[in-house]
Each structure stands twice: as C-alpha cells, then as structure tokens.
Amino acid sequence: MDGEEAADIDETNSSNPHAAAVVATEMQAVAEAERPEEQQQQQMPQTSSGEADGDVDGDGVSAIAALATRVRLENMLEVVDNMFDEVSELMVDVTELMQRASELTGTTTPTPTAPENQAENAPEIEPAQPATPPEIAELLEEAIAANPLGHNVLNPGDDARSISSRHSGSDMSLDSPGSEDDSDAEAVPRWIIPENRVRSAVDMLVSQARNQDGGIATLLRRENFLQRVRSMVFSQDRVRGRESDEANLDAGNVVDEELSPELSPAPLDIDMEEGVRFDTNLPAEHSYFGPNLNRVPGVDYLEVGSTHRMLIFMHQHILFPGEVLPFMIDGSIIDEEIHDTGRDGVIFGVGFPLMQPPDDNPHKLYGVTCQIYEKGESGRQMVFYKSRALQRIVINCDDIQGPPQYIARNPTMKCYSKVKVLPEYFLPEPLKCIDMGSLNRFRDLPSMQDKFRRYQLTSTPWPLEACEEYSFEHIVEMARKKLEVHKIDTMPKCPIQLSYWLVRNLHLTEKMMRLTFLTDSVNTRLQIIGSTLKQESLFYCRYCNSSLAYCSDLFAMSKHGVQTQYCNSAGYIHETNTVYRIIAHAVGYSGEPSTEFSWFPGYQWHIIICKFCAQHVGWEFKAVDPNLAPKVFFGLAGSSVRIGKTSERTPTQGNPFVVRNLLHLVFREIE
C-alpha cells in the first residue's frame, strides 16, 4: 500500500469513528492477501519446476493482487457511502427542526435542501425579534446537543456581542467591513458557511439596499432574502478566488480610502442662483395660519427669583428665550385663562420633560415662560396662536396640579404649577470697565487695539488669564465668521440674547444644549459655545444613525435663523433645520408633493425618509415659481435627526445595532 492511500485512510478514520472499524477490516484483508504474495516471491528463486508451473504461480499471484485491490476499493466506497448517509441524516434533522420551528411561530420556513423553492415560500422577516419562544429555544438546544459539529451554530441565548466575538481569529468589526480574516475558514466543515463570510455578505446587501428605495425595510421584506445572502456569500468566494495578489493589494488600498474620514464639502453659494431671492420675513410671520391674526397685548418680564402660579404645557423640543413657538389648541383654554387672570396679555409655561435634570434634584422640570403676541379667529374650536419664549424657569414636579399635556397634541385640560424664574448673570469684560481718560479714543482703532490692551494690562492687578476668561469678543467674531456661509445677518448685540441666539444657530449637540440651558452665567454659556466652534458636525438619523447632511450646509430661510419651530395642519410642532443639500443616496421620498399649508410661501413640500430605515426625517421644498431662488432646499425635522461629530460617521452608514440584529436573524435561519 502506498503512502497516499494510507494518508487518505488515516484522514477518513479521524473524521468518522464508524469508518475506523471498516478501514481496519480492510487493512487486515489486504495484509492477508499480500502475505502469500510475498511468500511466493521469496520462494520463486528456489523453485526448480518448469516454465509452466511458473506461469501458473504468476497468474495466481496476479489474481490474488486483483482481488485484494477490489476488496480495498469496495471498502473505501462503503466508507464514503456511510459518510454521505450521515450527512444526509443530519440535513434531514435540520429540515425537520426548521419545519417544527416554523409551525410554532406560524411562518413558513424554506428547507435548506430545496433552495429553488425558497423564493416562493420565504417568510416576511421582521428586523427586530429579540425574544425567542421557549419551544424554539428547546429545539435549538436539542439540535446543538445532537450535532457534533455544532460549535459554529448560534445558541438560543446568544446576543449580538457573542455573535461578534464567536471567532477570535476573524475581524468582525462593522467599522471595517472590507477587512476580514479567513483563518477560521478551514476550522469548520465545508457545508457550514463561516461567520465572517455571512457578515461580509450581509454588509454588502445592506450597502446595496441603501441606494434603493425603501432601504433596509424593503431588503427584509423580500421573500428571497436568505437565498440572496447565500448567493452573495458564494459570489464573494468566487471573486476572492479569481483575484490575484496584486488585485487584492489594490482592493485594500480602496478600502483604506473609504475608511478615511470624509472631508466636509465646500458650502454652496446660493447667491449664484438666478432668480428672485426668497423673502426670509415670510416664514417668520407664519402666514400659513392665515391672514386673520390679531395682535395680543404684551406682558412685562417677571422678576428674577420670583415665584408665580401659571398654566403650563409640555414640549418635546428645548426652547430658548427669544424663540418663536407657534401652536394650535382649543381656544377655550386660553380664553378662560384671560378671563381668570383679568389681564389682556397671556403668559404660560412650557416644560421640557426630555431634558434630563441635574443629579442633585431629579424632581425639577426646566422650561421657559411664553407670551402670546398673536392669535387667530376665536369662532372655531381650534385656534392658531403665536408665542415667544421670554425667560427660563424651573418647576417643582411636586407642585404640578392636573395632568401635564403636550402642547403639540391638542391639549383639552388645564394644568397649573408654581414656577420660579431663573437669573441671568453677566460680567462685562474687565478691561472695558477701566476708564483710561483721553486714551479711550484709541480703544476702537484696529491699529491701536493691541497696544491699548497691553497698556491696560499694566495698569490693572488682574492677570491676563483672568481677563481672557471673561472676554467674549473673540468668540463672537469666530461665530460671525462661521455664520457668514449661513447668510444670517440678524445677530443681536445684547450678550444675554446673543448667547441664546448662538445656541439656536450654531447646531450644538443635545448635551451642549442642555449645558447651555442649565447655566445661569452668560459668560460660561458663551465659553461653552466657543468650545464647539471648531468642530465639524453632521446630521444623523436618530433611528439608525445614518448620516444625512453636513451642518456646514445650513442656511437661513427665516429671519429667525437656521432652526425654527413650525406647526402643521394637525397641530404638531416641528423643529426644522434648513439645509442646501443632503448627502447623496441618503433619503427617499414618501407620498406626493403638495403646496397645502406650506411653511414657505411659493414652495411645495415633499416628505423625505431615511433610505436605511425608512423613517420620516424631514421634507424637500421645491420652488413652484421658476424664478424663485433657491430652487430646492431641505428641512430636517429635529425630532428625527441628531447632531454629531463627523468622526462618528462609518462606512456602513447605519447603526451597528441594526446590522447585528440582522446578522443574528440570518444566523438563526441560515444555519
């Protein structure tokens, strides 16, 4: 027996315990058949018989050798047949298990032995099913215990993190889908697809789905989803096998380029568009409420630190003093409030439940006071109102009387509470408080400002660091330069109003907005704003974390700035951020365009949805008049987007949690 045959038999013995006995029998038969042959060969030189006897002996040896070879081949074929029978029995068990699981869940699961029928019988897959029924969990445990090769199959209790770390030799990072380690490819049988192959295939399908209408939701609803995953795995294997070393190196360079942080595109110059510029005063008037709006007398500012009992509502967005809040509620609520207070002006409180209070007092609710300055006709049940936020307040939750209701959800009941007006502390720059007599005329000369400043520092006991701590002129100048591209020229001069105005127009993160709202010091608020001026930010989908637009593309379609509150015909209030453009292939469209109740006169609106998760993220506004500029812009809904750093953007364009759930689902079905 030669070395190759012995190696084949040894490999077979190691893979199948039943085959070891068969192969041992085979080796014994071959040894017995070869032993007479060796004896005949040893005795042939000593034989003195004739040529006829030698021929007979030679024929006998050949017959014995042929018989031994036939026995050996038959035994090897029997071993192979036994192996195929065991694999077939295993596949039948898997098929029965999947059918039983389908009966328990009420779905029709395709059998792995009939992939051609899978497109017709595939179930509608939901993207998030974290809970596994107890019956299915028991079935999976039985299958894992019965399958000696089941170390690559998911356990019922596995979560996304355990899936990601199952193979220590493979790179399972979603941030780098192009890099994978094939070290585990030979560690599992050929009929089990390695985990890193499935991950790469799913990542490719998700990337393709982003460029199609419907996004990931449509991908999951397709009947042939699992078959498409398998096909993608095999297609990638074929491509990987055909590529040469040089092609692999080039592909690696492409992946590195994709993973490199993408620079923010150059801002568009809207003034270059031909046509009549849109009047930014129109959105600020909220003319979609109609022309019959009446002025309401104003009210005085409340004393800082004083406590008042007033009508309060809840709101899903954070309002800052100076911001306009349009809303639509039952007119009887406000009319009764005017009658009860005996004042012409109306003031009420708005609380922000979504803004987390400080840890030292979790029973506090922060908000603002709002003054109604215009109202619609009172002849119908729902009345339009326009109000403006005035002062920051804090509400003790224990003092609330009545059920708190959101102002955007057509409140029908009243809710009162005691509120305390928060202070606003401002310390002017120390050097500006020093009277230099006749030298004051050099204070505002650009060529003399540095010399004048150095001269002031020599005449004061304060160090330079203390003076710069309360200096905000450089912050205002940096903010003005950054807002030049937004076409905003309504920056207030009062430091208190300026601090709130910058928060609304400099697209801060939610954490920074909370910090700026809670601080009572205007100087500290400006310092917080100044720390974010050099950061490049992106708008991300709040549901799946896909990047939608660059904050550098913000511009003002209203004289109030780039972020404004608008009310739709159903009374829901949207915080809208207007941008020139969005990232390519980031959104799709839903429904038909309409001009009804348009927030921007002369434009039609069209609902846009995230292409990755198919959730509503805003609107596209397109000019109806061809002479109106800009021709097209977008409004991103504040409740559907969040602001984050550009470094958070990943090539997968989606939340890793979504992809991990998808992988969990695929592994449970495909294995």
From Swiss-Prot:
The keyword ATP-binding does not apply. Its main location: nucleus. It comes from the Eukaryota. Residues 39-51, 105-115 have a biased composition (Low complexity). InterPro entries: CULT, Lon_prtase_N, Yippee/Mis18/Cereblon. Zn(2+) binds at C541, C544, C610, C613. It is found in: Nucleus. One of its GO terms (biological process) is positive regulation of Wnt signaling pathway. Residues 1-11 have a biased composition (Acidic residues). Pfam families: Yippee-Mis18. Ubiquitinated. Residues 162-173 have a biased composition (Polar residues). The keyword Nucleus applies. Residues 309-537 form the Lon N-terminal domain. PROSITE patterns: CULT, LON_N. Residues 536-645 form the CULT domain. One of its GO terms (cellular component) is nucleus. Signal peptide: none annotated. One of its GO terms (molecular function) is metal ion binding. Residues 1-59, 104-130, 150-187 are annotated as: Disordered. Pathway: Protein modification; protein ubiquitination. Keywords: Metal-binding, Nucleus, Ubl conjugation, Ubl conjugation pathway, Zinc. Belongs to the CRBN family. Likely a component of a DCX (DDB1-CUL4-X-box) protein ligase complex. May interact with pic/DDB1. Substrate recognition component of a DCX (DDB1-CUL4-X-box) E3 protein ligase complex that mediates the ubiquitination and subsequent proteasomal degradation of target proteins. Has an essential role in mediating growth by negatively regulating insulin signaling. It also has a role in maintaining presynaptic function in the neuromuscular junction synapses of third-instar larvae. This is Protein cereblon. It comes from Drosophila grimshawi.
